[in-house]
Amino acid sequence: MADLEEQLSDEEKVRIAAKFIIHAPPGEFNEVFNDVRLLLNNDNLLREGAAHAFAQYNLDQFTPVKIEGYEDQVLITEHGDLGNGKFLDPKNRICFKFDHLRKEATDPRPYEAENAIESWRSSVETALRAYVKEHYPNGVCTVYGKKIDGQQTIIACIESHQFQAKNFWNGRWRSEWKFTVTPSITQVVGILKIQVHYYEDGNVQLVSHKDIQDSLTVSNEAQTAKEFIKIVEAAENEYQTAISENYQTMSDTTFKALRRQLPVTRTKIDWNKILSYKIGKEMQNA
């Protein structure tokens, strides 16, 4: 081990540490960071060399953050990244500094975003917040209005998590939806992501995603927002149901097909206990 450490350059050590951090399961960033810190044994090198990994993790995970003085949380995403550690809260029309390691927001200041699309953005956000409140008790959403390639574009992000360290599991749901405000008909593009880590008496991870495309009729702001939410709800319900059904099937068939009649320990295994993981069901109720 000592010989291996001598062969690794600081750059290689940081690269390995950054990979561990970026792939940390939801809710376990601090645990992974502390383990990597012990392995690297060089705080300055870790902070300077892996700073990009801290940022990438928060962007990828849609990390929610509470800004002092404001009621609603906002998501840390690439769509709100203003550069130099600053992020946009489109609902409250402010920007703020975000510490990717401490996950803290500071220095909120007024910020004017794309005013030309604000009425559309606001209508979609109002409808999406109602949807999230109904389906995701711990959910947070942020809606952006941006001009992309000359087109007025709405981007809606949803995050919901349950961190149950005492019960040995953590999970996070993320979805991102995008459409351009164009006359008559537009294309809605979405991606749904679910990630769960269960680590009692074993180590099981669920990492799944699904791409969505659908057509949206564009009329006025309120009606378009309503139709958009119908698409979101149908797609997310279908995906969550499919996840649950797949785990039921795996419990009934796949896992049982892998077993011995009697394991090496000569003790029969309760394969139905695998179903008790209830990963899909737990996230569906998240």
UniProtKB/Swiss-Prot annotation:
Residues recorded with modification N-acetylalanine: 2
GO molecular function: actin filament binding
PTM annotation (Phosphoserine): residues: 9
Entry's Gene Ontology cellular component terms: cortical cytoskeleton; F-actin capping protein complex
A biological process from GO: barbed-end actin filament capping
Signal sequence, start to end: none
Keyword Transcription among record annotations: no
Record's keyword annotation contains 4Fe-4S: no
UniProt subunit comment: Component of the F-actin capping complex, composed of a heterodimer of an alpha and a beta subunit. Component of the WASH complex, composed of F-actin-capping protein subunit alpha (CAPZA1, CAPZA2 or CAPZA3), F-actin-capping protein subunit beta (CAPZB), WASHC1, WASHC2, WASHC3, WASHC4 and WASHC5. Interacts with RCSD1/CAPZIP.
Annotated family: Belongs to the F-actin-capping protein alpha subunit family.
Name the record gives this protein: F-actin-capping protein subunit alpha-2
Organism in which the protein naturally occurs: Oryctolagus cuniculus (Rabbit)
